[in-house]
Amino acid sequence: MIRIFSTAQNKGLTNMMLFILRATVSCFMLVHGIGKWQMLMSGADTSQFPDPLGVGHSTSLGLAVFAEVVCSGLLFIGFATRLVVVPLIFTMIIAVFVVHGSQDFAARELGSLYLIIYLLLLITGSGKYSIDHFIYKKTKPTNY
């Protein structure tokens, strides 16, 4: 019973949950990104895609595709995690506060959840089950 209230972390379980979180959120975001990628590749009219930054509809779509497809793919494998979540955080900030900013919370809820998860991953990093961990382990200086 006392263990329920313990604040000690189980590193193995924490690393496994970071992997599950990364893999799940990446796959979910890829679902959003694939549709945008298909729109971009098909040469369809992009004038309906929001342009909140004033850089053009096609450029805005391209930036969203980069974040939601490329960065999500890299996040899935845990490569440069803290770097690749930055475009995802930026995309979610734009989606939540600019694109859906005037709508009720229900329209902003999913983007807010993604934003919180990406902020968490920015702080924690990818965990042990990632390419980042493998690279860091190989390049980490030894203490003499």
Predicted regions and their residues:
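Extended, low-polarity transmembrane helix blocks
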Residues: 1-38, 58-66, 70, 76-144
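Membrane-interface loops
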Residues: 38-44
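Short, small-residue-rich loop/turn micro-motifs
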Residues: 41, 53, 91
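Perimembrane loop-to-helix junctions flanking transmembrane segments
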Residues: 44-57
